[in-house]
Amino acid sequence: MTTFWSKRRTTGKHRQVKKHYTQMTLQEKKQCVKLLQDTVNKHKYLELSSHCKTKIKNKINFSKLVGFIFKSNNAPFNIIEFNITDFHGEKQRRIIFKSPTIVTIEGVSSYQYLVINLEDGTIITTYYNGITDTHKTLDLDYYDANLTIK
């Protein structure tokens, strides 16, 4: 599977502050789900950004995704990250959410991750990791365990 690597990373500490799910309490994960629910209730949809449309390799079942966010007791365990990103001078709260559907990408069973902008319900981008990926290269120095989720 090919990996997309952007030269314009948002992971720089000057552009983004973020909290990884391993640093969150269960209550914080539930708060992230509540923020997603509030976003869907307010905007009535989740919409793919033009950037996301160039990255997506499968069809998203939006009714299944939204149903999972609202009805599944497992939704908090699909929260991967909460972040606040400086996007052209505006602060955007974003959640990375693991889709409940396993997809096959380039012959590899994969999890799909969605970066959802809480300000407008836009799915900013998506990426895929094989289901056996253990994230050995994850650098928690980029994360802030003290970030308040709100």
Model-inferred region functions:
Residues 1-150:
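Ribonuclease/tRNase effector modules and their secretory precursors
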